Amino acid sequence: MSQATVEEKSKLRVIIVGGSVAGLTLAHCLAKANIDHIVLEKRAEISPQEGAFIGIWPNGARIFDQLGLYEDFESLTPPVHRMNVRFPDGFTFSSYLPRTIQERFGYPIISIDRQKVLETLYERYPHKSNVLVNKKVMNVRFSGKGVSVVTEDGSAYDGDLVVGADGIHSRIRSEMWRLADENHPGLITSQDKQAFTVEYACVFGISEQLPSLPAGEHINSYSNGLCVITFHGEKGRIFWFLLVKLPEKTTYPNTPRFSASDAASLCNKFARFRVSEDICVSDLWMHKLFASMTALEEGILERWHYDRIVLLGDSVHKMTPNIGQGANTALEDASVLASLLNNLSKLSTEDGTSAYAMTKLLNEYQSTRYERAKNTHDKSRFGARLHTRDDMIKTLIGRYVFPYAGPRVLERSVKSLATAHSVEYLPFPKRLGPAWGEYSSPNKSTLGSTPIHMLTLLLPCLFYFMYSKLNLFVSL
């Protein structure tokens, strides 16, 4: 018998808008806490095939394991154990950092078809009648002591909190801004309304097995204004993305949209670009099962909530896929919000659902998550520009520092992952590795200063390079 059938359900009611990875994970968390909730999804199905994939790192894996879901995902694909990096001058190097991450944390890095993740989250969710499809949200209304969500079909859903887990094109974010503008003009700044910008586009693809790309390996192939990254999964299935710098920077929502023909044209343009010694972009495209092209928004909001509305995941912070932390960061959002709601649900009905209590909770949610999410966003932003050799400094760092900075990169990765947030009211899994205990609280500077630390590493290398060239010149 489930916990929900033996304990009185909390009077608190949460409306989750978006059947995304973040939204469904939050639903699982709330189900574990016995908090009443529903999920409203605008599409006709929860898990459509869109050609996208997600990487699950230890910080996300631990949350999934707390929810009893991780083994389902782990069984779908082999772990990544080796990373191979290629530069335009033909220089390559390999690193077993992914294997070391697994040894330190007890969880490997895995890449999975996003459709499979959504499918598993839905199939393992205990209250499927709470997940409603074909529910496109039209507006949000504050009503007495609560909030109401109205959908396109005229239905209205009442609750104490609305959570926008509806992605970068968030309707809930738009409604939050509208209501704030009506009731507290100036609260939402022009900076927040222009926070998301686009400088890159990306083709995401899934391809059939290619003999020279062995399962469990991962390739980064860098060039000027371009990078291709691949992950090789179960039975050799290839998850890949081609990321390219666009001619001009645009601001959301006035950003480009791309079609299937745009994806084909871009991959044709770079058909001869080498992913490895034997594989080019044309090979990935010829063997594709699915592919799609999208603009890559980047940005993070300064205000994550207003009144009884709160945002999480891509609706509040959006990053490129280069460091594989977009979904994992959203999972951390869900875990923190659920933990705070669990605490709130234990108060009396009147105290637990009051506007004051909700505002206090949402302030704590943002203050807990903001700096870590901001640091992750900044690292992802730097990673995209490092991988595409965006300027001379990043070109030099990528080519002459990164290949030789393995221990430093590992230690910074460990520190960042070890200080991740999790679901406070659920026990930690038994499989946790030793690295989790090395740092006691979420770190505030591990990621944000990445460029400065890289420059610190770069200068000695440059001096050595210049000294070597000078000696060569003198010897001539």
From Swiss-Prot:
List of catalytic residues:
222
Q: Which Pfam families match?
A: FAD_binding_3
- Family under the similarity heading: Belongs to the paxM FAD-dependent monooxygenase family.
Group of enzyme by EC: oxidoreductase
Its cofactor is:
FAD
Q: What does this protein do?
A: FAD-dependent monooxygenase; part of the gene cluster A that mediates the biosynthesis of the fungal meroterpenoid acetoxydehydroaustin. The first step of the pathway is the synthesis of 3,5-dimethylorsellinic acid by the polyketide synthase ausA. 3,5-dimethylorsellinic acid is then prenylated by the polyprenyl transferase ausN. Further epoxidation by the FAD-dependent monooxygenase ausM and cyclization by the probable terpene cyclase ausL lead to the formation of protoaustinoid A.
According to its UniProt record, where is this protein located? Membrane
Q: Which organism is it from?
A: Penicillium brasilianum
Assigned EC number: 1.-.-.-
Q: What is its main location?
A: membrane
Q: Where does FAD bind?
A: 41, 55, 114, 314, 327
Task: Supply one GO CC term from the record.
Answer: membrane
Q: What GO MF terms are annotated?
A: FAD binding; monooxygenase activity
Q: Which gene encodes it?
A: ausM
Q: How does it sit in the membrane?
A: Single-pass membrane protein
This protein's name: FAD-dependent monooxygenase ausM
Checking PANTHER family in the record gives: FAD-BINDING DOMAIN-CONTAINING PROTEIN-RELATED (PTHR47356:SF2), FAD-DEPENDENT MONOOXYGENASE ASQG-RELATED (PTHR47356)
